[in-house]
Amino acid sequence: MISSNDFRTGTTIELDGQVWRVVEFLHVKPGKGSAFVRTKLKSVQSGNVVEKTFRAGESVQQAILEKSNLQHTYVESGDYVFMDMSSFEETRLTSEQIGRGAKYLKEGMEVNVIFHNGKVLEVELPISITLKVTETDPGVKGDTASGGTKPAILETGAQVMVPLFISVGEMIKVDTRNDSYLGREN
């Protein structure tokens, strides 16, 4: 159990059968009446964000999460197979469990998988990864009327917008949180 007075950004709690992460919190002490804690909670499973108010000192069940560092080994019949590098146990995850990060997975990549009561809650990819451009239109010199970017398909099948000077075969860094181009990789 955790007191609502101890809430911090990133604290995970169990509420109504779901696991929630505290995104924002504010301790309020009105001049009249008792103190309370106003929070913004994000569901780890669905991503929904709700606002909830707790009485000051109210006890809430803290969610106990396990974080494992797993390496993506291969894909078999639609399932992504990961291996725990310390115990060599295999874990199979579907693309729904991995979420939007599945398009960036390549063999040998290490990810953090967060478990709650033995069930996968989320898969954390590295913030930036380096991938090879496999398909893109050639950049025409002086063609900047469209904003200076063009679509490119990467080695994993992901599509990102890149500057006009990027060509097929180049290695680029991509931000996995918002699918944005970060720069060339030497």
UniProtKB/Swiss-Prot annotation:
Keyword presence, Nucleotide-binding: no
The record's InterPro entries line, in alphabetical order, gives: Elong-fact-P_C, NA-bd_OB-fold, Rib_uL2_dom2, Transl_elong_fac_P/YeiP, Transl_elong_KOW-like, Transl_elong_P/YeiP_cen, Transl_elong_P/YeiP_CS, Transl_elongation_fac_P
GO molecular function (one): translation elongation factor activity
One GO CC term on file: cytoplasm
PROSITE patterns, per the entry? EFP
Does Ion transport appear among the keywords? no
Name the pathway it acts in.
Protein biosynthesis; polypeptide chain elongation
A Pfam family (short name) is EFP_N
User: Taxonomically, which superkingdom?
Assistant: Bacteria
Q: Which UniProt keywords apply?
A: Cytoplasm, Elongation factor, Protein biosynthesis
**Chief location:** cytoplasm
Location in the cell reads: Cytoplasm
Q: Name one GO biological process term.
A: peptide biosynthetic process
What's the stated role of this polypeptide?
Answer: Involved in peptide bond synthesis. Stimulates efficient translation and peptide-bond synthesis on native or reconstituted 70S ribosomes in vitro. Probably functions indirectly by altering the affinity of the ribosome for aminoacyl-tRNA, thus increasing their reactivity as acceptors for peptidyl transferase.
The entry's family comment says: Belongs to the elongation factor P family.
Note the NCBIfam families from the entry. Answer: efp (TIGR00038), PRK00529.1 (NF001810)
Name recorded for this polypeptide: Elongation factor P
